[in-house]
């Protein structure tokens, strides 16, 4: 299911114009990239505020309708008020179906409770990363990546190279030789010493 957003072209610019928009419950934003020029837009603040709470909104191709014309975009930047529950500005990037995109997608960790290091050794799993940057064509973009922790033993670490991805999805960090950790199973205190004595 694709998330849909409704927006209107924004004619007025500047701090004063944006302040007036916000006082009317509207949110200033911009769309850039793809084959088009940068376009100033305004959106319904309340609608966007609640959509931003959805995990998929941050890592999916979104359908935005500007004055009735639809475009495919990615969320690129959100500026929040320092202490109010208010979005100040939002940026979207146009997506071309024939061009690879770089997107951070969330990691969903499963089977921690049946990992031998947890179940048998009483260890604890530490999530070193909660999202990773991937590169793929828009049609291949996963909403999230599942990380299976069921094989983790005390003291073991899962790395980027251990993640199971579809064949058309790449991890730029791995292409650069950075096989970063994703999760570590921390042994219960004294566990490592006890197991080495046995």
From Swiss-Prot:
InterPro entries in UniProt: Rbsml_bL25/Gln-tRNA_synth_N, Ribosomal_bL25/Gln-tRNA_synth, Ribosomal_bL25_b-dom, Ribosomal_bL25_C, Ribosomal_bL25_long, Ribosomal_bL25_short, Ribosomal_L25_dom, Ribosomal_uL5_bac-type
Please list the GO terms describing molecular function.
5S rRNA binding; structural constituent of ribosome
Q: Is RNA-binding among the key words of this record?
A: yes
Where in this chain does the entry annotate a coiled-coil region? none
Annotated Gene Ontology cellular components are: cytosolic large ribosomal subunit
Q: Which UniProt keywords apply?
A: Ribonucleoprotein, Ribosomal protein, RNA-binding, rRNA-binding
Example GO BP: translation
Establish whether keyword Nucleus is in the entry: no
SUBUNIT field:
Part of the 50S ribosomal subunit; part of the 5S rRNA/L5/L18/L25 subcomplex. Contacts the 5S rRNA. Binds to the 5S rRNA independently of L5 and L18.
Give the protein family.
Belongs to the bacterial ribosomal protein bL25 family. CTC subfamily.
Q: Which PANTHER family match?
A: RIBOSOMAL PROTEIN L25/GLN-TRNA SYNTHETASE, ANTI-CODON-BINDING DOMAIN-CONTAINING PROTEIN (PTHR33284), RIBOSOMAL PROTEIN L25_GLN-TRNA SYNTHETASE, ANTI-CODON-BINDING DOMAIN-CONTAINING PROTEIN (PTHR33284:SF1)
Question: What is known about what this protein does?
Answer: This is one of the proteins that binds to the 5S RNA in the ribosome where it forms part of the central protuberance.
List, alphabetically, the NCBIfam families matched.
Answer: bL25_bact_ctc, PRK05618.1-2, PRK05618.1-5, PRK05943.1
This chain belongs to the protein called Large ribosomal subunit protein bL25
Q: Which organism is it from?
A: Nitrosomonas europaea (strain ATCC 19718 / CIP 103999 / KCTC 2705 / NBRC 14298)
